Each structure stands twice: as C-alpha cells, then as structure tokens.
Amino acid sequence: MAKASLDTLPRSVPQKRTAGDLAKDLFVLSRFNRYNPLLATFSGVWATLLAGASKRIDHPGSISTEYVFKQALLVFVGGYIFCGAGMVWNDWIDLNIDKQVARTKERPLAAGRITNTEALIWMMAQYIASWYLIAYTLDGHNVLEAMIPVTISTILYPFGKRSFFKTIYFYPQYFLGFTLGYPSVIGWLAIKGQDQSLQDNIMESFALGTTVFTWVLYLNTAYSYQDIEGDKKANVNSVYFLAGSYIHYFLVFLAALVLGATSLQLKAQASQWLWGSWLSVWGYSFASQLSRFSAKDPSSGGTLHKENFALGVWTVFACAVELLLKS
C-alpha cells in the first residue's frame, strides 16, 4: 500500500524555511490556490437554497430569505474547509503514486516541501473546524449523520485507486461522487432538519444527490483521463480503464444520467425558471463538451473539468434566483 510513515519525510525538507513558506505550502496542499475545493461546496449550497425555496412555498412566512442565505454560506464554508482536509489526506495516502505522475509530483508532500507531521496537523485542524461549523449550522441536530458518511467516503477515496478495488470493479470515482453528493442532505438538514425526520430530508434531497454523484463521475472521469499514461505506470485504478476505447460513449452515458437525475429534482421543485436556467444550460453545455472531447487527446478532459466548474457556479446563481422568486 502506497502510504508514508508518519515519521518519515517524503524527501528532504529545506533547511531554511520561513513561516510564510510553510503557510503557502499548506495552502497549496489543501488546493486553496485552485478552484477544485469549490466543487465540494456546490451540492450543499444548491440543496440549502432549493430547500429554502421549497419551505417558503409549503409554509409561507416561516423562514426568511436572509436566514436561507446565511445557512447556505455556513454550509459553503464548512464544505470548503472539509474538502481542504480531504485533499491533505488524499496526498498523504497517495504520496508514492504522486511522485510518479507528472501532474502531481510537485505537490508539497510529494516534492518534500513539508513533513507528514505538519500535513496531518493541518488536516486535523481543518477537519475539526468543519465539524464545528456544520454542528453550528445544524444547531446540534443530526451532526453525526451529516459528518460520518462523508468522513468515511473521504478516507476510502484514495484507497479506491488500489488494485484490490480494481478486482471488484469498484472505482475511486464512486467514493468521490458520494463525498461530493451527500452534502445535499446536509443542505436540506440546514433548512428542514428540525421540521422533519432525517429520512424525509434524505428522500427529498436524493435526486439532487444522485445528480451530483453522476455529475462527479462524468467530470472526474474526463479530468483524470489526462493522467492515463502516468496512471498506467503506477497501476492506478480508475473507471476510465473500464471504459477503455469506449470512453467517449461512456461519458455520453454519464451525461445522460446527470440530466435524468436533474429532471427528477426539478420536477419536485416545480419551477419553470430552473428548467430553463439549469437543465437547458447543462444540456447545451454537455453537448458542446462531448463534441470536443477526444480519446486520442487526453488533455481535452482538463477543459471539460473547468467548464463543469463554471456550470456549478452558474447553478448557485440559478438556485439563488429561485429562492428570491419564492420570496
């Protein structure tokens, strides 16, 4: 198993290093210098806004628009910090793999700019902070149910790249999809957690969670495909190896699943605005992305990833407008 010892340095840590250098490397280790952690916030924020709009329809005057936006902000910050902790965990477990892949070998741990101890202390600080924020957001209700599932899936994600999971046809994208999709439950709990049971909140957010799960499979498969040569050398398990030469058709299939699950959620919301601003925009974007993806050019997957991030940001706006329309 490719895992570093807690007391072993990945390489030699520079002898002269300022506190600013350490802070910068920890910032980069959590990917806070990139847009990637924001992907972990979309599901929870969308869910919070949609649940707020739904509650304003079912119980007019029972909840203010300002409160919903405040809860959405708390869910956003909690998810962002949690993702930072998950990035550190992933890099620690994948240390030896990252050294062999061109895109990852200069990450702070793989490059030896920080020690394992420093990384793990940073990881735990972020995890504790995210737990506190979610507990505060949910007013102490269903905190374990909100945090434990995503914690387990985050822990298992890097191990999903190992040969054991490959033998049972289980891929890391499944863990990642769950980790990024389950916060839809947290977002729903942030609005309706004290009004209805956990089971009801899960059921109402299930279609949205499925949307995000399949969306993550789609965008991560396209994105990680650019590492196919390095992953072959490192014997990394990934779902695009299952697709093989049919990778393009596989992405089309995943895009169809995303749109299907989205349709179920929007049907429950009963909003003409969301049908146009969400489903239509996503459908057009997927068609454009898939027309440009090439199995012969793995780097084309990187562009798809960025465009899907833009879709996520746009959908935050669409859900915010939906809330305002119901106010």
Swiss-Prot record:
Residue spans crossing the bilayer: 35-54, 73-93, 118-138, 140-160, 171-191, 202-222, 239-259, 307-327
GO biological process: terpenoid biosynthetic process
EC number from the UniProt entry: 2.5.1.-
Subcellular location: Membrane
Topology class, membrane: Multi-pass membrane protein
InterPro entries cross-referenced by the UniProt entry: Prenyltransferase, UbiA_prenyltransferase, UbiA_prenylTrfase_CS, UbiA_sf
Group of enzyme by EC: transferase
Pathway this chain belongs to: Secondary metabolite biosynthesis; terpenoid biosynthesis
Cofactor(s) listed in the protein's UniProt record: Mg(2+)
GO molecular function: transferase activity, transferring alkyl or aryl (other than methyl) groups
Biotechnology: Shearone derivatives produced by this cluster are interesting candidates for Alzheimer's disease (AD) therapy since they moderately inhibit aggregation of amyloid beta 42 (Abeta42).
Entry keyword set: Membrane, Transferase, Transmembrane, Transmembrane helix
Function: olyprenyl transferase; part of the cluster that mediates the biosynthesis of shearones, diterpenoid pyrones (DPs) which are structurally diverse meroterpenoids consisting of a diterpene linked by a pyrone, and which may exhibit a range of bioactivities.
Family: Belongs to the UbiA prenyltransferase family.
Name this polypeptide is given: Polyprenyl transferase esdpC
Organism of provenance: Penicillium shearii
